[in-house]
Amino acid sequence: MKKLLAFLMAALMLCCVGCGSKPAADPTDDVAADEPVEIVFWNVFADDSDTGVFLSQVAEKFMAENENIKVTIVGQGGYDAIVERLEAAAASNTLPTMAIIEETFLGRFYPLTVDLSQYLSAETIANYQQGLLVSGYYDGVLRAVPFNRSMPNLYINRTLFNEAGITDVPTTWEEYFATAEKLTNKDKGVYGAGICWDTDAWIFESILYSHGGDIISEDNTKIVLNDTTVAADIVTEYQKYIDEGVVFNPYIYQDNVWSTIGSAFLEGKLAMFLGSNGVYSMYNQWMKDAGYEMEIHQHPDAANGIATGAGNIVVFSNATEAQRQAAAKFMTYLASDENAAAYTVLSGYLPTTVSCVNDPALQTFLQENPFFQNAIDQMQFAHRRPQTKAWKSIYTALADELAYCMTYTDTDASASIAKVAEQAQTMLDEG
């Protein structure tokens, strides 16, 4: 309770700072060349990871071109870890200038962030992929912009499709399970499909949207998860196909669920699964090394809505005016065609801007990996995720219950969803 009160007090103090009489900055103004300024950028990458190294290299290039601005890159160990450290920093008024946060955490941190429309040019904002930008607004104010963003896509082992004599890739859920049945080869230990709901129930959330369901009302005041039978029906259907040996169930193993399902896919024991496009480049190389042909396609029934995920960049309101302008300049630099395209090629994350898709490096990547275009085209169906500070507690309860339903497939899914919905409403009401 003391930690929460301290966090809220810090939020109020910072909001008061942002409500002063100082006029909004002109987003076209440059930081004065004779005024050195340092910006600190917390991120979710390991310093020695490909993405961490990329960010550091881009910062070095930026500083070489802007000698008055020092960019300090600090890896904070993942989305959950960075949230804990940001909360502690908020309580002690030691927040960094800017940070990457998972998009759903904007509901917790928006009081501490600046309105980016006051610092980024209209041209820069308009060039972001609008499907990815939907989660950057809170109460109509632009608080975050996309950086390392992803969506669930359908990964298939084309080699197994060919062996089963199947050409068409399923585009609806009805086709998905029908195709999974045809792909299943129990003699060879091959499952037609697999499922991992993810630790924050992200995959379940996306499947729910694609079925026309939802978790929370648009105004973030009411849990609607159990208002229809859609959520329970999804779980029940997966339980059925698991019991029939059509869907691979990683929840019955002791290992990490994603690692288990990934290993099954790489070993040719799994023909299809829903996963983040953010692992595309890595998985594609691994599958080639294993002698398999992999493709990435759109999520079944994508047009009904698909969850987006991963990181957005925010700037905190405790930053000085010079730091805010410098941060905006660095964000604009990250969103340049060259840098945005290079990041997609390196990581497999979605291209964050419209124009970077035409960059020569990304065009070459698409020529070599034509199925990745499906991930790009799917962005138009992005569905805004819950933006409430109670979301972490809610998704933890949901993910735990979903895992239980998979571990014990005779569990009544209707009762489980009803229980989670009731718990989630209490969490939402308590804030």
Predicted regions mapped to residue ranges:
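Short, well-ordered beta-strand elements
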Residues: 34-48, 69-74, 97-98, 143, ...
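Extracytoplasmic "Venus flytrap"/periplasmic binding protein-like
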Residues: 61-128, 137, 159-167, 171, ...
